[in-house]
Amino acid sequence: MVQQTFTGRKRVRKFFGHIREVAEMPNLIEVQKASYDQFLMVDEPEGGRLDEGLQAVFKSVFPINDFSGTSQLEFVRYEFEAPKYDVDECRQRGMTYAAPLKVTLRLIVFDIDEETAAKSVKDIKEQDVYMGDIPLMTMNGTFVVNGTERVIVSQMHRSPGVFFDHDKGKTHSSGKLLFAARVIPYRGSWLDIEFDAKDIVFARIDRRRKIPVTSLMFALGLDGEEILSTFYKKIIYKRAKSGSNADGWRVPYDPVRFRGYSTLNDLIDADSGKVVLEAGKKLTVRAARQLQEKGLKALRMSDEELVGMYLAEDLVNPKTGEIYAEAGEEITEKSLKALNEHGYKELPLLDIDHVNVGPYIRNTLSADKNLTREDALFDIYRVMRPGEPPTLESAQNMFQSLFFDSERYDLSAVGRVKMNMRLDLDAPDTYRTLRKEDILAVIKTLVDLRDGKGEIDDIDHLGNRRVRSVGELMENQYRVGLLRMERAIKERMSSVDIDTVMPQDLINAKPAAAAVREFFGSSQLSQFMDQTNPLSEITHKRRLSALGPGGLTRERAGFEVRDVHPTHYGRICPIETPEGPNIGLINSLATFARVNKYGFVETPYRKVKDGRVTDEVVYLSAMEEGRYHVAQANLPLDNRGRFTEDLVVCRHAGEVLPVTSDKVDFMDVSPKQLVSVAAALIPFLENDDANRALMGSNMQRQAVPLVRAEAPFVGTGMEGVVARDSGAAIAARRSGIIDQIDATRVVIRATEDLDPTKSGVDIYRLMKYQRSNQSTCINQRPLVKVGDVVKKGDIIADGPSTDLGELALGRNVLVAFMPWNGYNFEDSILLSERIVKEDVFTSIHIEEFEVMARDTKLGPEEITRDIPNVSEEALKNLDEAGIVYIGAEVRAGDILVGKITPKGESPMTPEEKLLRAIFGEKASDVRDTSLRVPPGVQGTIVEVRVFNRHGVDKDERALAIEREEIERLAKDRDDEQAILDRNVYGRLADLLENRQGIAGPKGFKKDTKITRSVIEEYPKSQWWLFASPNDKLMAEIEAMRKQYDESKKGLEQRFLDKVEKLQRGDELPPGVMKMVKVFVAVKRKIQPGDKMAGRHGNKGVVSKIVPIEDMPFLEDGTHADIVLNPLGVPSRMNVGQILETHLGWACAGLGRRIGQAVDAYLASAKQETKPLKETLKKVYGDNETIKSLNDHELVELGRNLSRGVPIATPVFDGAKEADIEQMLELAGMDKSGQSTVYDGRTGDTFDRKVTVGYIYMLKLHHLVDDKIHARSIGPYSLVTQQPLGGKAQFGGQRFGEMEVWALEAYGAAYTLQEMLTVKSDDVAGRTKVYEAIVRGDDTFEAGIPESFNVLVKEMRSLGLNVDLHNSKIGSATPTSEAAE
């Protein structure tokens, strides 16, 4: 049940879920915060920081040695200083919220002995060096960069490690599977090992030319024999003793090796000489085992059966050293004969049978042209650096640096762990480079795959993809910056006199700071935060993108990468992803998912012990989960937590299968752990088609915050969580009592967590009518009254789109599903005028306009009211500084800020000179460049900000704004001071009361009792003078006084700092003297053309707004608010909206009954609450919260419920059909959920009953006002002289090829000619038309379109001279005048 919170008592949701939630849902923006905290590690722990995050970056780059080795620059530690501006100041001033990074460096200078070359330390210097600013994360997981909020999206990429794959038979025409292995490091060169069609194994480094894999092994220091002994077993064939059962070779018998063996000759037992298998038969696995059981020890092989085998060692004459045959050589009849002649009694052969073991490595070895390590190294050098002559040393160094140098190659801890798991190795995860053993293990595993042992990897398995969050992305970026810096430092260390410099002189922090700035400013993963509503903020922070640097590109990403994978369960939402080219590449984290320290996504499960489900929660990654059987959360359990059914359907290794209940290892914690936050907000999600659910999730993020937010009647129980975690609603930081409150701030006197070092007062500033990134309105309003008691975590103020601490994206409206005169054809929506009149779907949008006054070559621009050629009427909204008043109503074309710019001197006519001489300097040398309201905007000025460059005099307006701000700061300081005084002096009086007084203020009698009345005779500041013989008491009072003085001083200091910041000039871009920002609030009522949607992907456009009296109405005279087309449901299969409608209808009915009970209570003389309590009990059953309320709270609750009883129906565990019917019955309504409806215009009943109920509708951010656009004349393109396109450019409508065909088909010749000439790019013609229209004349002539001239110019650029001859028709001689 909802815990007893301050808002939870004001509105109680009836909960339909049956499954008890065991795990707490993690904070929804934890992904961002935890990752960045781990990177920064702001507070240095005892014993220094661990090697991760920023510390690891510094450790990896430092120490830096100079080229000669005489000096070394070491990293000691780093710390952050306090940020210069706080978050709000950064937003207002367009700054970046960042903290300066201070690094302590140590420069060590060595003395080097000339003869012994021994080093001794000559000098050590330590110094703190400023290393640029590092952006800080705000409380809500965002960054403020240049005044705008940005989010760094987490990236999904391929985990480092080793992957085995095949080409699916696409490379070779035969369809043969070519296997390949790829070692992917975190940074460094990729190593590919692959088969070709002839079964030779090759290696590639960084996708370059391939080299035989044996060359790679030579370079690793193996020779031919070692290579063969690594990959193949050795079998000794012994010459049978001549004379016993004819000549031949004796072979030890191994049933595993001989299974599947096809015989050419009879198989003969070497000891008994009996035939064990006739020629031409195949030895089955069973038969092979039986032969061993019968005691078969060895087989006899004839000479010809050895032909085609391979030697395992070089065969050498021990006396002469002559090599008869080399290791890996194939035995031929000729070579066998020679060996027999030399009298070899034993032959070591390779165990290659072409069935279980293939000769791939042996074949590669024989095909390899390189025979020694040197050749192989040279070959690799030539591949990596073609065109450079190799030397042995350079080749060795290059090969060493490719895979074995920690500077150049890093597998990362993840890569090492993955590699160990895949190849069964046990290297520690601190070992981050490749080892010889790793490369050999990869080749072995690959060869085994080719031999049919083992499985290839699934690249889309979440065990093979990991998440890089903010911290890690930032770490990589900062490392890049430091490496750039390192080069510069090395050069500087060599070029300066090292004995006299300090670390400060060696370091230039610009490259590091630039790398950070570049990352936040222009990386693909640093995105402008989607701030339309709280849900869109949260979703943006929980987004996982496969795009971005080091990731995929849209074009390259195939179908498999985008698809839903079984391992997504509980980790990545299968529903929420964009439609369009990014589908499946951008995903959302599931509700309970979290990212572990290795970057793999984990999901929680309940542990099952001995068939009993416990409450112990374990987080598993995709790799770990594959080993277990996991049951669903909605399985029925008995009261002891055992499964009621014997067979349980489980997920195991990507399959779904029924198993007995004792085999189950884990169980899901919640049914909604499968989906993301946005999908978990859709009630009856289980009744919607997945495609529509996807649209529903995506459209909730586009819902515009309305003027009056209203929580949904039918919710899912997630609404409160989203409102709290997004930071839209304000939660109390500590428990306390509300002390003061107004529209802009709430002051709470803390009663718990009282820390003597902090003030006992929390002041919460509310955001009033601020502009969000998407121009929607951010406005917070308090929910508490003075004297209310709140607990830590209670919601004390609602934000945009929240209602009593719950997410409220839209409004509950009365819907009728029926056609209405074709106005809801094709998903159109018909609305009642009530919705416009009562501002149900009205939203406020705040537009920001800015103007800068720069210093130009001709003189400074000026912001002023004195503008040339502008009437007084147009200046009526401006103050004396030329800036618009707050509260002024403005419309398109009005001046917001007057500005004049100096004009270049144009040559004067004699008349002008004369006038200038007579009247002196005239204002003709400036032009009007004022900021005006753009077309399509009209509204009210809500805020003006003026920024001045340092040293520029502030105008009256800027000073007024400054004064206002200082007053506000002073009020904050005084309030905090007053509460501090009240607290401290109250405690002091309590301590002193009834004590023996041995001293006191002037006039206090010694050794008398200190009573409350005595204390209060004196001013508070003198209370500290009282003294008592109790030393312990006096020590406490002294500590209190010290603390009080410090707090007081701190308050004053903070106030002075802020004032100083206000009065200091602003940091403006170069050349800008002054900047003014004006904010205009636009009120947008809903109108035809606006897009609306429900939560089930049921979207539509408003087609008509009908007078209330014309809307269909019910028997009690209630008119429907909205009419939707019933045909929108069946084909789209989003039946959730119908269930929501029925349930909403029941909620409203129950709300009405509770409302009647409240009215009865207020009307009755006795004011008896029993009937109200009984009504509530019928609805809610035995609810703890309701039982605990007093009469006053009960009535408030009843009032809040009278519009409708809110209910929660969680996804996959919500209300069933029976529950809905029961609710309808309880509300005294028809169980069918349908009602008789009358036509508003005729009063007749409609033939059949109509589904009527309450549905939650959203108004989306696609408003017709932002899209509608018209132009008569405007800007033209430079080259073609055609009008520009698009609303932003104030462009025209394109009249394209097909439209031209239409006019041609109608034969509208004159219209067509206008379209192609005077209305487009006939420059002279269009001017003439304009003049003609102004004159009231309607004759004009079309000339030559500019595009013709462009064509002529293009042909000339190709060397074809084209001349255009203008000639009147009928004249004999054409005039040879080219049209230029």
Swiss-Prot record:
InterPro entries: DNA-dir_RNA_pol_bsu_ext_1_sf, DNA-dir_RNA_pol_bsu_external_1, DNA-dir_RNA_pol_su2, DNA-dir_RNAP_su2_dom, DNA-dir_RNAP_su2_hyb_sf, RNA_pol_bsu_bac, RNA_pol_bsu_CS, RNA_pol_bsu_protrusion. Keywords: DNA-directed RNA polymerase, Nucleotidyltransferase, Transcription, Transferase. It catalyses: RNA(n) + a ribonucleoside 5'-triphosphate = RNA(n+1) + diphosphate. GO terms for biological process: DNA-templated transcription. One of its GO terms (cellular component) is DNA-directed RNA polymerase complex. Its EC number is 2.7.7.6. One of its GO terms (molecular function) is ribonucleoside binding. Pfam families: RNA_pol_Rpb2_1 (PF04563), RNA_pol_Rpb2_2 (PF04561), RNA_pol_Rpb2_3 (PF04565), RNA_pol_Rpb2_45 (PF10385), RNA_pol_Rpb2_6 (PF00562), RNA_pol_Rpb2_7 (PF04560). The keyword Ribonucleoprotein does not apply. Gene3D superfamilies: 2.40.50.100, 2.40.50.150, 3.90.1100.10, DNA-directed RNA polymerase, beta subunit, external 1 domain, DNA-directed RNA polymerase, subunit 2, domain 6, RNA polymerase alpha subunit dimerisation domain, RNA polymerase Rpb2, domain 2. The RNAP catalytic core consists of 2 alpha, 1 beta, 1 beta' and 1 omega subunit. When a sigma factor is associated with the core the holoenzyme is formed, which can initiate transcription. Belongs to the RNA polymerase beta chain family. DNA-dependent RNA polymerase catalyzes the transcription of DNA into RNA using the four ribonucleoside triphosphates as substrates. This is DNA-directed RNA polymerase subunit beta.
